[in-house]
Curated annotation (Swiss-Prot):
Disulfide-bond pairs as recorded: none
Keyword field contains Magnesium: yes
tRNA processing listed as a keyword: yes
Name under which the protein is recorded: tRNA dimethylallyltransferase
Gene that produces this protein: miaA
Function: Catalyzes the transfer of a dimethylallyl group onto the adenine at position 37 in tRNAs that read codons beginning with uridine, leading to the formation of N6-(dimethylallyl)adenosine (i(6)A).
InterPro entries: Dimethylallyltransferase, IPT, P-loop_NTPase
Subunit (UniProt): Monomer.
Cofactor entry: Mg(2+)
The species this protein was found in: Nocardioides sp. (strain ATCC BAA-499 / JS614)
Residues of the site described as Interaction with substrate tRNA: S106, R127
Length: 310
């Protein structure tokens, strides 16, 4: 069910990975008596900390955070489930008279939470067959199949994202309609919703991504992946396909050198960030503010206030 409309706004901070969303979300939560709701598909997994840039507890400024560390790496997590979890958290936060501040890099998850979005059904037999084909043929082959039946969906889904490719093919098969026909409509489920985007130029973002990946490896990312593999990461239908974790797993099995794993992580993150930016830029409801604007927080607060006055 969609959140019940009330006077409290729903605020979402959006933008590409490494753009500065986390810092702005904390600043807004402090100014708006808010609580953070994670919308990153991978930060829900316990132990996936370094590779997802999950904010340590000590750096959360005492602000309550929701939908972090709720699943094991073996647990699957669908967009429909995430929508249900997040909307429940939003309703509880608003019920306490506080402001939910959503932040995370998963554009589809954010849209599914904020917009009117009813999910098509599932067929476990079809899903299992497609997942077996994914394991046997690889994501590139299934992506080509998707391109043949739903070209628009293929342009929106990364070749590496086998999980979403499988879901798109499943929806096409069981509904007879393009997967894109089931994507969220651009209509908020609750009218008191506002999106603030962190605008950052590509050269600066690319440099930040390199710095972030280097910091991940320096902070013990390889050891994190090694530990999670022992906990079943490779068998995880969702967590097992996370950027960086796949590449390091390939290093640990001897398929890649450490330098290759690092470089592939940088490249995959850059591609992902471009796709994120493209998704969010298509939404005219997002108010974009430069990452280096001295009045970033004040301007964002003003955007929220304007929504309340509207």
């Amino acid at each position: 069910m969609a959140p019940t409309p009330n006077r409290t706004p729903i605020v979402a901070v959006v933008g590409a990975t490494a753009s500065g969303k986390t810092g702005l979300s904390l600043d807004l939560a402090e100014r708006l008596r808010g609580e953070i709701v994670n919308t990153d598909a991978m930060q829900v997994y316990r132990g996936m900390d370094i590779g997802t840039a999950k904010l340590p507890v000590a750096e959360r400024r005492g602000i309550p955070h929701h939908l972090l560390d709720t699943l094991t790496v073996r647990d699957p997590a669908t967009v429909a489930e995430f929508q249900s979890w997040a909307r429940a958290e939003i309703a509880e936060i608003r019920g306490r008279g506080r402001t939910p501040v959503l932040v995370g890099g998963s554009a589809l998850y954010t849209r599914a939470i904020l917009d009117r979005f009813e999910f098509p059904g599932t067929d476990e037999a079809v899903r299992r067959r497609l997942e077996a084909e994914l394991d046997a043929l690889g994501p590139a082959a299934l992506h080509e199949r998707l391109r043949a039946v739903d070209p628009e969906a293929a342009t929106r889904i990364l070749v590496e994202n086998g999980r979403r490719i499988v879901r798109a093919l499943e929806v096409v098969e069981i509904t007879g309609r393009p997967f894109t026909a089931s994507l969220p409509t651009m209509e908020y489920a609750d009218p008191r919703t506002v999106q603030v985007g962190v605008d950052i130029d590509r050269p600066t973002l690319d440099a930040r991504i390199v710095a972030r990946v280097d910091a991940m490896f320096a902070a013990g990312f390889v050891e994190e992946v090694e530990r999670l593999l022992a906990e079943g990461l490779a068998e995880g239908r969702t967590a097992g396909r996370a950027i960086g974790y796949r590449e390091v797993a390939s290093y640990l099995t001897g398929e890649l050198s450490l330098a290759e794993a690092r470089e592939r992580t940088v490249s995959a993150t850059r591609r992902f960030s471009r796709r994120q930016d493209s998704w969010f830029r298509k939404d005219p409801r997002v108010t974009w503010i430069r990452y280096d604007d001295p009045g970033l927080v004040d301007r964002a607060v003003s955007v929220v206030a304007a929504t309340l006055d509207g």
